[in-house]
A protein has these predicted regions:
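Short, low-complexity disordered leader/linker segments with a strong preference
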Residues: 1-29, 140, 323
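Hinge/capping helix and adjacent helix->loop/strand transition within the periplasmic-binding protein
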Residues: 82-88, 103-189, 238, 243, ...
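An extracytoplasmic/periplasmic, membrane-proximal ligand-sensing/linker region
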Residues: 29-31, 173, 261-323
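Extracytoplasmic/secreted proteins, especially bacterial periplasmic and envelope-associated proteins
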Residues: 46, 50, 54, 75, ...
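Short beta-strand->loop
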Residues: 111-120, 156, 178-182, 200, ...
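N-terminal (or domain-start) structured segment
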Residues: 21-113, 152, 173-203, 212, ...
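Short secondary-structure boundary segments
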Residues: 94-95, 132, 206-207, 225-226, ...
Length: 323
């Protein structure tokens, strides 16, 4: 009886594996949605659209990018989390829904640890940007100005609980300053208001900030990185002025819980192949983006878990309590 049970179980496992392989062989057979958790125009959105175009070519079906910003990425994350795990609804996310929100909100409509990471696409360093006529030329001068003008400056973020918001909170905590927080739903509207002078400063991706900096429409004062960047050699890091702040805005492709491993593997291979394409690499390099290709699902999952732990430490260090 025991031997018969083992045979039955083994046969079931083999049949399930064969079915998964067959499903992956015919995948995709219809259009695939990629839900982006931020508004159009930012680094996460741009990288996703570049990869989606290559996936269409390699897998033979449309990969439709759909922006669902709001609630620090939770709106888009919920759409994917509750979707069928069949490979036709994917999430391209910033750190917020997968690594940050659980530390800021007592109740979420999804389990951040329940997603199935497929691949890391990109990492974009964050930088401190001020409007072009802000009364400070260096980060030291900016901090000195903030200290004698408490509550008079405004800082924009991509929403409550996003990397840009938490980085700004850490800056205030470490310097003993205060600013008015102005949350947005994405990077593009922040850029518009920084250029127009409606907000004073922000932490955003260097890919967006460098364009404004080079055009004289805004100024990068410091890098939220561990070391200086080759393409901005004259811009200091916050660590150089005694502020140990280092944050990236990364972009991961994930699937709903329990998606078949064979489909995960097929998508992982296709995403990595897309990131190896010379035109994609050049475009991402021009956008000052660190390419995250040639990583497997297990590596992506490990990266997200490490980020989740580190962001939890940052939230606690910032003195923020779950709401």
């Amino acid at each position: 009886m025991f031997r018969l049970a083992v045979i039955v179980l083994a046969s079931g496992a083999l049949l399930a594996g064969a079915a998964q392989a067959q499903d992956a062989a015919g995948y995709p057979s219809r259009p695939v949605r990629i839900i982006v958790d931020v508004a159009p125009g930012g680094g996460v959105d741009t990288a996703t659209r570049l990869v989606a175009a290559k996936l269409e070519q390699s897998l033979g079906q449309p990969f439709v990018v759909e922006n669902r910003p709001g609630a620090a990425g939770s709106i888009g994350a919920e759409v994917v989390y509750t979707a069928e795990p069949d490979g036709y609804t994917l999430l391209a996310s910033s750190p917020s829904p997968l690594a940050i929100n659980q530390w800021l909100y007592k109740k979420l409509s999804y389990d951040p640890a329940g997603f199935q990471p497929i691949a890391m696409m990109s990492r974009i360093p964050n930088v401190l940007v001020v409007r072009s006529d802000f009364p400070a030329k260096t980060v030291q001068e900016a901090i000195a100005w903030l200290k004698v003008n408490p509550g008079k400056a405004s800082f924009a973020s991509q929403g409550v609980g996003t990397a840009s918001h938490l980085t700004g909170v850490m800056l205030m905590k470490l310097t003993g300053t205060s600013m008015v927080h102005v949350p947005y739903k994405g990077t593009a509207p922040i850029l518009t208001d920084i250029i127009a002078g409606h907000v004073d400063m922000t932490f955003i991706q260097v890919s967006n900030a460098s364009v404004m900096h080079d055009a004289g429409k805004a100024r990068i004062l410091a890098l939220a990185t561990d070391k200086r960047l080759d393409f901005l050699p004259d811009i200091p890091t916050l660590a150089e002025v005694g502020l140990p702040i280092s944050t990236d805005t990364w972009n991961a492709i994930s699937a709903p819980p329990k998606m078949p491993a064979a489909i995960v593997a097929k998508l992982n291979a296709a995403v990595n192949a897309a990131l190896r394409q010379p035109d994609v690499r050049k475009r991402l390099h021009d956008l000052k983006t660190i390419i995250g290709g040639d990583n497997g699902p297990a590596e992506a999952a490990k990266f997200v878990e490490t980020e989740r732990r580190q962001w939890g430490e940052l939230v606690r260090a910032a003195g923020l309590e779950p709401q």
